Amino acid sequence: PLAAKNSFALGANRLQRRVHDELGLDYTLGQVEALALSEADRIGGLLVKACAKYGQGQSAESIIGKARSEWVPEGDLLEVYRKETNRVASGFRKAKAVSFPKGDELQVRLVPEFMRHLYPTAAYSSPGPFEKRQRGIFWVNDLSLAKSSAAEKLSEVQQHFGISLTAAHEAYPGHHLQFVT
């Protein structure tokens, strides 16, 4: 069936074609959906087992919520991001899990005040594909700088819980390596 007029959806026929042509998969849409649902169930089961083993049977949401509420980074948030981004990159380098292009450069910077409303916590800006200097920018939005009370500042900083995952997503092996290689 075709997608409804003025819809962003492709419709089943075009989506099937993209699965084949762009991903090189000879799966039907039904097979793709079944595989995705099966994988979601498998990972969900692993999460339940891990919560039972390490979280005394609590839900993942409550375990993560508790960890977030107890997380207080030491020092300046931007510096914490810089250190963690370097630590994550070093881990991938040491493991030789991905290749790092010669001369790549990543700067971790605060989001400018006039752009704070555009980024929830962090974002990445890539260099142009033909720029000689392949410098990317990993933007950190520290909204605690705009708060006055200690409780408000802490609440904003705790939105950044999971910095290592954010660094992996935005920098190494994430968007930065994706765009500079």
Question: What role is predicted for each listed range?
Answer:
Residues 1-181:
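N-terminal maturation segment of proteins
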